C-alpha cells in the first residue's frame, strides 16, 4: 500500500483488526458437507450444519492443524488445552441460534506479526511489529440474499442460503497497535500472504475468504485513556480498509473538536459514497451469553503433534525476504515484491537455481514479466516462459552472447510460446557481435563516411560519440556489444 495521507498530528488513532479467514478444507468444520464456493443455494447442507435436534458435531482435524500452523507462523503460544463455546445470538442465517466458537480458552494466544511499510516515492521500507491477541476456530454463518437490493434496506424480500453455514473460520484478533489506514491494510495483506504460503486459504477478499472488521478510536496525542471504540464492517478490498479508516479517523476527530458524542456502534463502509454509516449499537461479549459447548470434548495438543505440525511449515514470507536480502543481495523493495506471491517466489528461485545472477533475474521478474502478467491478467504459472528458460536468457546476457536489447526483443515470443532462448537467438541470427575486429571495421567505415562528424568530435564535441555508437547498432541490427562498441568508438575517434 502507498503511504497514507497524514491525519491531524495532535490526534492519534488506536486501531485493532478482527480478521476472519475462511479455510480451504474440502468439508465443513463439524460435518462432512462440501465447502465448495458458488454451489446452488442450500445444496451443501445436512442435519448437523442445519442444527437439527439430536445430531452431534465432530471436529474436522484439518481445521485444528490449520489453526496451529497459523499460530506458529504468528510466533504465538499454542494452548495445550482449549475448548469450544456457544456464542448465542438470533439471526436468520444462523439455524441453531448459536455459533460454535471459542471464548476464554482459544487455541492460540500472544503472537506477533511484522509488517513492512513502503514509501511511495523513495521505495524505502520500514518495519513495525503488530501484536496478536488471539486466534480461535469457529463456524461460519449462512448468507442472506436480499432481493431488489444488495442490502436489507430497499429489498422486497430476503432469502437464506445455508451452504456457508459450518464452513471453518479462523478469527485472528490483533492488539490495538495499528495507527493508520496504511498500517491496517498492510497488516491484512501480510496475513493473507501467510495463509496463502501455508496453503490453508486463498485469502480472496472479494469472495469473502478473508473478511476484516476494524475497531477504531481516536485520542489526543499523549492521552493514556482510550476514546470510544467504533467497529467498521463491509470492506472487501485492502484499499477499502485504508479508505474506511482514513474517513473514520477524520469523522471522529471532527466530532471530538465539535464536542459531539461518539457512540460505541457498528458502522458500515459505503463504497459508493466513500463514507461510514451507522448500522447498529455494538454488542459486548456479555450479550452473547457464552457457555462451554457440551457436544464437543476439550482439545488437547500434544508435544508430538505440535512438533509434527512445526515440521510441515514452509519458509514464510518474512523469512524469504530476509534470505533474499542477506544471501542474494536484493533490495528490501525487490525482496518484498518477489515474495508477495508464493508462486512468483518459487518461479524466481527456480530461475536463479539455473546459475543465473540473482539480481538480474529479479529485475526481469519484477519489471518486464510483472508488466506482462498485469496486462494479460495471467498468473506466473500460466505463462509459456518457464523459469528454466528465464535463467537461460539471463545467462546468455551475462556471457555476452546477446545484449539486453536483444533479450527484450525475443521476450514477447518467449512469454507467448515458450521455448529455448538460445535456440531462438541462433535460428534468427541474433547473437551478439563481441569480436573487436568486426566492430572496429564498422566504426572505421562510419568514420570514413562521416569525416565532418569526426572533425567536430576531435574539436571538442564529445557527445558525437553517441552518434557513432548509434550508427554501429543500426548497421549491426542491434547485435554489437554496446559496452565494447563504446570503448572502441572512443579509442578510434581519439585517433
From Swiss-Prot:
Signal sequence region: none
Sorted UniProt keywords: ATP-binding, Ligase, Nucleotide-binding, Protein biosynthesis
Pfam families: GatB_N (PF02934), GatB_Yqey (PF02637)
Alphabetized Gene3D superfamilies for the sequence: 1.10.10.410, GatB domain, N-terminal subdomain
Entry's Gene Ontology BP terms: glutaminyl-tRNAGln biosynthesis via transamidation; translation
GO molecular function: asparaginyl-tRNA synthase (glutamine-hydrolyzing) activity; ATP binding; glutaminyl-tRNA synthase (glutamine-hydrolyzing) activity
InterPro entries linked: Asn/Gln-tRNA_amidoTrfase_suB/E, Asn/Gln-tRNA_Trfase_suB/E_cat, Asn/Gln_amidotransferase, Asn/Gln_tRNA_amidoTrase-B-like, GatB, GatB_C_1, GatB_Yqey_C_2, Gln-tRNA_amidoTrfase_suB_CS
Keyword GTP-binding (UniProt): no
Catalytic activity: L-glutamyl-tRNA(Gln) + L-glutamine + ATP + H2O = L-glutaminyl-tRNA(Gln) + L-glutamate + ADP + phosphate + H(+); L-aspartyl-tRNA(Asn) + L-glutamine + ATP + H2O = L-asparaginyl-tRNA(Asn) + L-glutamate + ADP + phosphate + 2 H(+)
SMART domains: GatB_Yqey (SM00845)
EC number: 6.3.5.-
Role of this protein: Allows the formation of correctly charged Asn-tRNA(Asn) or Gln-tRNA(Gln) through the transamidation of misacylated Asp-tRNA(Asn) or Glu-tRNA(Gln) in organisms which lack either or both of asparaginyl-tRNA or glutaminyl-tRNA synthetases. The reaction takes place in the presence of glutamine and ATP through an activated phospho-Asp-tRNA(Asn) or phospho-Glu-tRNA(Gln).
Quaternary structure, from the entry: Heterotrimer of A, B and C subunits.
Family the entry assigns: Belongs to the GatB/GatE family. GatB subfamily.
Entry-linked PANTHER family: GLUTAMYL-TRNA GLN AMIDOTRANSFERASE SUBUNIT B MITOCHONDRIAL AND PROKARYOTIC PET112-RELATED, GLUTAMYL-TRNA(GLN) AMIDOTRANSFERASE SUBUNIT B, MITOCHONDRIAL
Name of the featured protein: Aspartyl/glutamyl-tRNA(Asn/Gln) amidotransferase subunit B
Organism, scientific name: Crocosphaera subtropica (strain ATCC 51142 / BH68)
Lineage: Bacteria, Bacillati, Cyanobacteriota, Cyanophyceae, Oscillatoriophycideae
Name of the gene encoding the protein in the UniProt record: gatB
Amino acid at each position: 500500500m502507498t503511504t497514507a495521507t497524514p491525519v491531524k498530528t495532535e490526534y492519534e488513532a488506536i486501531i485493532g483488526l478482527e480478521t476472519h479467514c475462511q479455510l480451504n478444507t474440502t468439508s465443513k468444520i463439524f460435518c462432512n458437507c462440501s465447502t465448495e464456493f458458488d454451489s446452488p443455494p442450500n445444496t451443501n447442507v445436512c442435519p448437523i450444519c442445519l442444527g437439527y435436534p439430536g445430531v452431534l458435531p465432530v471436529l474436522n482435524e484439518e481445521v485444528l492443524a490449520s489453526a496451529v500452523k497459523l499460530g506458529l507462523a504468528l510466533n504465538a503460544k499454542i494452548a495445550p488445552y482449549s475448548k469450544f463455546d456457544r456464542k448465542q445470538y438470533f439471526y436468520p442465517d444462523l439455524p441453531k441460534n448459536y455459533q460454535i466458537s471459542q471464548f476464554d480458552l482459544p487455541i492460540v494466544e500472544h503472537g506477533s506479526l511484522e509488517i513492512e511499510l513502503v514509501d511511495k516515492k523513495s521505495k524505502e521500507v520500514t518495519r513495525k511489529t503488530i501484536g496478536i491477541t488471539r486466534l480461535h476456530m469457529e463456524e461460519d454463518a449462512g448468507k442472506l440474499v436480499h432481493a431488489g437490493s444488495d442490502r436489507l434496506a430497499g429489498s422486497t424480500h430476503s432469502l437464506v442460503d445455508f451452504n456457508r453455514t459450518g464452513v471453518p473460520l479462523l478469527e485472528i484478533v490483533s492488539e490495538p497497535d495499528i495507527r493508520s489506514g496504511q498500517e491496517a491494510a498492510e497488516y491484512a495483506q501480510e496475513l493473507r500472504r501467510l495463509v496463502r504460503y501455508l496453503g490453508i486459504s486463498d485469502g480472496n477478499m472479494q469472495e469473502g475468504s478473508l473478511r476484516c472488521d476494524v475497531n477504531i478510536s481516536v485520542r489526543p496525542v499523549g492521552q493514556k485513556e482510550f476514546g470510544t471504540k467504533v467497529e467498521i464492517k463491509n470492506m472487501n478490498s485492502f484499499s477499502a480498509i485504508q479508505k474506511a479508516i482514513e474517513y473514520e479517523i477524520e469523522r471522529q476527530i471532527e466530532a471530538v473538536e465539535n464536542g459531539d458524542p461518539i457512540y460505541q456502534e457498528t458502522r458500515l463502509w459505503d463504497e459508493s459514497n466513500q463514507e461510514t454509516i451507522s448500522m447498529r449499537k455494538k454488542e459486548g461479549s456479555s450479550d452473547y451469553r457464552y457457555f462451554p459447548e457440551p457436544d464437543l470434548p476439550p482439545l488437547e495438543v500434544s508435544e508430538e503433534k505440535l512438533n509434527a505440525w512445526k515440521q510441515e511449515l514452509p519458509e514464510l514470507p518474512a523469512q524469504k525476504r530476509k534470505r533474499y536480502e542477506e544471501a542474494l543481495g536484493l533490495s528490501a523493495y525487490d525482496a518484498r515484491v518477489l515474495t508477495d506471491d508464493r508462486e512468483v517466489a518459487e518461479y524466481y528461485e527456480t530461475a536463479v537455481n539455473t546459475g543465473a545472477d540473482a539480481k538480474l533475474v529479479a529485475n526481469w521478474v519484477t519489471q518486464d514479466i510483472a508488466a506482462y502478467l498485469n496486462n494479460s491478467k495471467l498468473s506466473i504459472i500460466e505463462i509459456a516462459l518457464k523459469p528454466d528458460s528465464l535463467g537461460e536468457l539471463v545467462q546468455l546476457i551475462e556471457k555476452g552472447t546477446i545484449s539486453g536489447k536483444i533479450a527484450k526483443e525475443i521476450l514477447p515470443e518467449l512469454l507467448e510460446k515458450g521455448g529455448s532462448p538460445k535456440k531462438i537467438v541462433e535460428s534468427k541470427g541474433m547473437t551478439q557481435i563481441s569480436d573487436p575486429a568486426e566492430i572496429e571495421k564498422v566504426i572505421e567505415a562510419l568514420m570514413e563516411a562521416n569525416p565532418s562528424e569526426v572533425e567536430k568530435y576531435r574539436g571538442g564535441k564529445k557527445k558525437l560519440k553517441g552518434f557513432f555508437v548509434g550508427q554501429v547498432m543500426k548497421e549491426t541490427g542491434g547485435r554489437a556489444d554496446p559496452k565494447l562498441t563504446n570503448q572502441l568508438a572512443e579509442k578510434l575517434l581519439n585517433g
